[in-house]
A protein has these predicted regions:
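Acidic, surface-exposed loops and disordered segments
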Residues: 2-304
Length: 304
C-alpha cells in the first residue's frame, strides 16, 4: 500500500534500462524500502517491499549509467541534477563563516528584493530534506513591503480577536496545558499580544517589521512537522549567501493554527497545518561587527 501524502496516493514506478545496466548492485544497496533486489545477477523490482517505492530517487541518483527511471509521486528522470560538474562545494570553514556571521535581521533598507534572488531562495528551500517525499511543504510568498504589511495587519487583527485568552482574567487557563506552558504564555505571549495590538493601532508593524519579502512555510497533516522548519532554514541560509538578512517569526502559525479561517482562505494557507514558520527577508539596514557564540542546553555523548 502506498504511503499517502496530500500530493499523491500512489507508489513510484521503477523502470530499468537493462542495456545500460552493469549489474553493480548500487541501487539495491541504497534502497532502504527493499523495493529492489538482485535476481539472476541483475536488479529487479521486489514483490515484497517495505512500503513500496516512495520515489526518494536514491537508486536513480546513485546509478553510474543512468539505467534507472523513476516516475510517479511527483518524480521523473528529468529531475536528476548532474553533480559531475560541481567542483566548488562549500568547505567547513566557508560554511562556518556563513552561519556565524548570520544575525536575525529586523531592520531593513527601503530596497526591493530582485526576482532572481527570490527564485534562488525558493530553489534552495525546495532542496531541503523532508520526512517523506514528495515534500508536503506549502509556501506562501509575500513580495513587497505593502503586501507584507497587509498580511501582518490581518494577522494582528486576529490576534486582537483572540486576545481575551491572554487577559489577566483568563491567562490562568494555560495551567491546564502544563506549568511550563503557563509560564511561557504569562512571560512571553501575554505581553507580546498586548504590545503588537498597541503598536498596530499606531500603524507600526512589529510582527513582520515591514520587510520587503516574507515566506510562510507550512506542513500538511501527512508530513513530518519538522519539514517546514528545515525548508525555512535552507531559505534563510540561501538568503545569507546572497547578501540578504533574514529572521524567523514563530508567533504567526501557533496563533492562527486552529482558527482564522477567513484569513487562511484569503492568503491560501492550508487550513489543517500542524506546523509552520514565517521568514522575513531584506537588505540589512545595519551591519554587525561581531558574531555570538551559542550553546545547547545540554550535550550528552555515548560512545563504544
Amino acid at each position: 500500500m502506498a504511503i499517502i501524502t496530500s500530493r499523491t496516493n500512489k507508489n513510484g514506478r521503477i523502470t530499468f534500462i537493462y542495456d545500460r545496466c552493469n549489474s553493480c548492485g548500487l541501487c539495491v544497496n541504497v534502497c532502504k524500502d527493499f523495493s529492489l533486489i538482485m535476481e539472476d545477477n541483475k536488479p529487479v523490482v521486489s514483490s515484497h517491499p517495505l512500503f513500496g517505492c516512495i520515489a526518494c530517487g536514491q537508486c536513480m541518483a546513485v546509478c553510474p549509467n543512468k539505467a534507472i527511471d523513476i516516475s510517479g509521486r511527483e518524480m521523473s528522470v528529468d529531475d536528476l541534477i548532474d553533480l559531475s560538474g560541481m567542483k566548488n562545494k562549500t568547505s567547513y570553514d566557508q560554511f562556518k563563516n556563513l552561519i556565524v556571521g548570520r544575525r536575525s535581521i529586523r531592520d531593513f533598507k527601503e530596497q526591493k528584493i530582485e526576482e532572481e534572488l527570490i527564485d534562488q531562495i525558493i530553489e534552495a528551500a525546495v532542496s531541503a530534506p523532508m520526512g517523506l517525499p514528495p515534500s508536503d511543504v506549502h509556501l506562501v510568498v509575500l513580495k513587497g513591503k505593502d503586501k507584507v504589511r497587509e498580511f501582518s495587519f490581518d494577522v494582528l487583527d486576529y490576534f486582537r480577536k483572540i486576545s481575551w485568552v491572554f487577559s489577566d482574567r483568563m491567562i490562568w487557563i494555560w495551567w491546564l496545558a502544563g506549568n511550563e506552558t503557563y509560564k511561557l504564555m504569562k512571560s512571553f505571549a501575554q505581553p507580546l499580544v498586548r504590545f503588537l495590538a498597541e503598536t498596530k493601532d499606531k500603524g507600526e508593524n512589529y510582527l513582520l517589521y515591514d520587510a520587503p519579502l516574507a515566506m510562510y512555510f507550512t506542513a500538511s497533516p501527512y508530513s513530518d512537522p519538522a519539514d517546514p522548519y528545515i525548508a525555512a532554514t535552507y531559505a534563510m541560509l540561501a538568503a545569507e549567501s546572497l547578501g540578504l538578512g533574514s529572521c524567523m517569526i514563530g508567533s504567526v502559525h501557533p496563533t492562527i493554527q486552529y482558527g482564522a479561517g477567513k484569513l487562511k482562505r484569503k492568503w491560501n494557507i492550508p487550513y489543517k497545518s500542524p506546523s509552520g514558520i514565517v521568514v522575513i527577508f531584506g537588505y540589512p539596514k545595519y551591519r554587525f561587527k561581531s558574531g555570538i557564540k551559542r550553546s545547547f542546553a545540554n550535550v550528552t555523548y555515548f560512545a563504544n
